[in-house]
Regions:
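Acidic/polar-rich alpha-helix caps and helix-coil junctions
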Residues: 1-194
Length: 194
């Protein structure tokens, strides 16, 4: 997932996300300055051996203070996920930003934002040993949805909007937001008015 996608997830109160609210001056920083702020030192095995300037709890809070669908969709820095590659048992892993890692053409997970900061998909990706080949969805017990209820509601909302029935469009749209406790459109704050 791109940094642009992740940054589109709003704060839990519905305000647009802004890195400067978490780390003042972040938006004006160069990629190298951001790397200094967000990265840790890791050894060859992927173990964190030094925090450098990184406040990993504060970095993680930049993601957990937002729309809960972000954490369900994306593995963000300093969050946990279940890994299994090359092992016979599942391992609880932390996705950390290694200061010594440099982007290159072979590292698909490190291409965003001047070749350094990136994210991993969580939603619809199997984690750990699912008892089947991860390269073929038919060989895993993970049930991939063909159509999602939220998609149906959003399509209905779009149809109402195209038909000029904004109130009905907002009602259907808000059903999706309400499922995760996000404030509805036209629910009070100025930033939620459409």
């Amino acid at each position: 997932p791109s940094t642009q996608l992740v940054d589109m997830y709003e704060f839990k109160d519905g305000r647009p996300f802004n890195w400067d609210e978490i780390f003042p001056g972040y938006n004006a920083m160069t990629p190298e300055q951001r790397k200094e702020l967000l990265s840790v030192e890791m050894d060859g095995s992927g173990t964190i051996v030094g925090l450098r300037e990184a406040d990993t709890a504060k970095i993680l809070s930049a993601y957990t203070c937002r729309d809960p669908r972000l954490m369900a969709t994306v593995i963000v820095p300093y969050s946990h996920y279940m890994g299994n590659i090359g092992r016979t048992t599942n391992v609880d892993l932390i996705f950390a930003l290694d200061h010594n890692l440099a982007g290159n053409a072979n590292g698909g997970t490190i291409q965003n934002n001047a070749g350094w900061v990136s994210y991993l998909y969580r939603k619809f990706v199997t984690e750990g040993d699912q008892g089947g080949a991860i390269s073929n969805r038919l060989h895993t017990p993970f049930a991939f949805p063909l159509i999602r209820f939220a998609d149906v509601l959003l399509m209905l909302s779009e149809a109402y909007n195209e038909a000029g029935q904004l109130d009905k469009a907002v009602t259907e749209f808000n059903k999706v937001r309400a499922r995760v406790g996000m404030p509805g459109l036209n629910s009070g704050p100025a930033w939620m008015v459409v």
